[in-house]
Amino acid sequence: FCGTGMSTAKLASQNPKALVIGIDKSADRLRRHVQTQSRNYHLIRGNCEHIWAQLVSASVECVQHYLLYPNPWPKKAHFKRRIHGHPSFPLLKQLGGAIEVRSNWKIYVDEFAAAAQLLGLDTQVESLSATDPLTLFERKYAANSENLWVCRAAPA
């Protein structure tokens, strides 16, 4: 999800006392990252579901999760590839903390909110104004005047 690490670096600079971890499957995207002055972040190549499972088994508690512009897998046959349709989705709740999902697909954000509510999380969906984009996708979508959406979920 972290792509080239732009969002990870931005979140680290905005939260200097936090350890920020960015995860992406693509070595190519991670290689394109330009290190910033912030030293409180790391980029990891891997699958989120495997890393979440390891963190849960190690009893790690998180403060905040950002799931930024995930592949929406628009075909019905691919529902289980969506974060909220994957069997590992409950691990996010087990890790604790608030969750923020951003997408240019409103249905994706609405589905995520409904699934998070089934886990017992409080959710709020609203439009997003990308005046200071967190990701390259967010920058591109905002430049193309696409509607952006955010779901914020937190323990009830």
Regions found by a protein language model. Give the residues of each.
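S-adenosyl-L-methionine
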Residues: 34-59
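A short SAM/SAH-binding and catalytic strip from SAM-dependent methyltransferases
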Residues: 64-79
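Class I S-adenosyl-L-methionine
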Residues: 108-115, 119-156
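Conserved SAM/SAH-binding beta-strand->alpha-helix loop
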Residues: 26
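Class I SAM-dependent methyltransferase "Motif I" SAM/SAH-binding loop
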Residues: 1-5
